[in-house]
Amino acid sequence: MTREEKSIAIENLTAQLAGTNIIYISDISGLNAETTSNLRRACFKAGIKLEVVKNTLLAKAMEASSNDYGDLPTVLSGNSAIFISDVANAPGKIIKDFRKKSDKPVLKGAYINSEVYIGDNQLDALATIKSKEELIGEIIGLLQSPAQRIISALQNKFAGSEEEGAE
């Protein structure tokens, strides 16, 4: 790779990092072609961008980014692939699902909404984080619940008073 190509790659990575608040870094080395293809397909279906990157280029892109990645660049050794998503738990769920069949991909670290998570031991926590949409749905459900109880009570009261009037 020439210096110019590296510079362009760093600019592209910096732009990708600037466009998201959710990045997972994992090691997918050792996966055969079929498994890697299945992983890419699953990522595509979930709206996740999966890209194998050079560690030095990713480290420089993180440096150039306006985000504070903390200790995340320290995990950049060996083979690295980044998962870029709009949903915080989607890459974690995919990695966890693939780990049922083999020991890879291994989570190196993640950056989610200004929080840095380092190590494969964080995978369970990251996979169970509720997405923004799930949280909004829960809040709406909680807000609707008291109103539904009141309406139900009023309907029962009204139905009871109609029965008494008919007798």
From Swiss-Prot:
This is Large ribosomal subunit protein uL10. Disulfide bonds: none annotated. Part of the ribosomal stalk of the 50S ribosomal subunit. The N-terminus interacts with L11 and the large rRNA to form the base of the stalk. The C-terminus forms an elongated spine to which L12 dimers bind in a sequential fashion forming a multimeric L10(L12)X complex. Keywords: Ribonucleoprotein, Ribosomal protein, RNA-binding, rRNA-binding. GO terms for cellular component: ribonucleoprotein complex; ribosome. CDD domains: Ribosomal_L10. The lineage of its organism: Bacteria, Pseudomonadati, Bacteroidota, Flavobacteriia, Flavobacteriales. Belongs to the universal ribosomal protein uL10 family. GO terms for molecular function: large ribosomal subunit rRNA binding. One of its GO terms (biological process) is translation. The keyword Glycoprotein does not apply. Gene3D superfamilies: 3.30.70.1730. It holds the Pfam family Ribosomal_L10. Forms part of the ribosomal stalk, playing a central role in the interaction of the ribosome with GTP-bound translation factors. NCBIfam families: PRK00099.1-1.
